[in-house]
């Protein structure tokens, strides 16, 4: 569970699973989006857990361009490759087999290095390096914005070091039924996802900061 606080709030807002936050005032909305962009150096936006521990910038996933968001970006792949390496560490027999095969490959290459006229040197290849060389990445098959959102959420759920996903103005591209389906999936995985919207998102449960800067809950069960 993540809490958010910024100057116009009287008290922190709890982001429990899927949370929709609508901000009617354009200047306040754009300012908050900017604070999220600059979270690593920003002092106005506070994100923290129920133990009052501040969220690190590396724990935040911010999506402002759904179709342009690269789930295979270098930072994400680094986390995935690291997780795969840990999986091998938990399976000693499989890890041993891979290391033996890697050693065989190294020996063959070493022999060719010795045969070469140049004075060549080499290093032993690690499992992590093998994963990178094999080009391990996420298979992307999304054809619609809804499918891309679902794909991003799945990646976020897999990445244990990410603790808050924020979609900016995604409601403009999604039907009510699609938003409901995304929220249902998010609530099942029990991780914090914030939909930050400049206008009310249908008649769904949401928090609204109106033009008088009052925070109200609408359509809450």
Swiss-Prot record:
What function does this protein fulfil? Answer: CRISPR (clustered regularly interspaced short palindromic repeat), is an adaptive immune system that provides protection against mobile genetic elements (viruses, transposable elements and conjugative plasmids). CRISPR clusters contain sequences complementary to antecedent mobile elements and target invading nucleic acids. CRISPR clusters are transcribed and processed into CRISPR RNA (crRNA). Binds dsDNA, binding is disrupted by EGTA.
Which residues does Ca(2+) 1 bind?
116, 118
Keyword Metal-binding applies: yes
Assembly and partners are described as: Homodimer, in solution forms homotetramers.
Q: Which family does it belong to?
A: Belongs to the CRISPR-associated Csn2 protein family.
Q: From which lineage does this chain's organism come?
A: Bacteria, Bacillati, Bacillota, Bacilli, Lactobacillales
Cofactor(s), by name: Ca(2+)
Q: Where does Ca(2+) 3 bind?
A: 139, 143, 151
**Looking at the keywords, is tRNA-binding present?**
no
- Spell out the protein name for this chain: CRISPR-associated protein Csn2
UniProt keyword annotations, A-Z: Antiviral defense, Calcium, DNA-binding, Metal-binding
Looking up InterPro entries in the UniProt record yields: CRISPR-assoc_prot_Csn2-typ (IPR010146), Csn2_sf (IPR038600)
Q: Which organism is it from?
A: Streptococcus agalactiae (strain ATCC 13813 / DSM 2134 / JCM 5671 / CCUG 4208 / LMG 14694 / NCIMB 701348 / NCTC 8181 / G19)
Biological process according to GO: defense response to virus
What GO terms are given for molecular function? Answer: DNA binding; metal ion binding
Which residues take part in binding Ca(2+) 2? Answer: 124
């Amino acid at each position: 569970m993540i809490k958010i606080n910024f100057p116009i709030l009287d008290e922190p807002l709890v982001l429990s699973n899927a949370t929709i936050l609508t901000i009617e005032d354009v200047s306040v909305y754009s300012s908050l989006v900017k604070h999220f962009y600059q979270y690593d150096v920003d002092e106005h936006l506070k994100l923290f857990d129920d133990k009052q521990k501040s969220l690190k910038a590396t724990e935040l996933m911010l999506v402002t361009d759904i179709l342009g968001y690269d789930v295979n970006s270098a930072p994400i792949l680094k986390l995935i490759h690291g997780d795969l390496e840990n999986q091998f560490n938990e399976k000693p027999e499989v890890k041993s087999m891979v290391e033996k095969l890697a050693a065989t490959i190294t020996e063959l290459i070493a022999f060719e290095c010795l045969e070469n006229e140049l004075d060549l040197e080499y290093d032993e290849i690690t499992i992590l390096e093998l994963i990178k060389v094999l080009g391990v990445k996420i298979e992307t098959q999304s054809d619609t914005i809804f499918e891309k959102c679902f794909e991003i959420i799945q990646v976020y759920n897999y990445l244990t070091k990410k603790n808050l996903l924020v979609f900016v103005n995604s409601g403009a591209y999604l039907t009510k039924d699609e938003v409901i389906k995304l929220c249902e999936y998010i609530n099942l995985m029990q991780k914090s996802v914030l939909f930050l919207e400049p206008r009310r998102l249908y008649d769904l449960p949401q928090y609204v900061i109106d033009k008088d800067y009052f925070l109200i809950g609408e359509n809450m069960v």
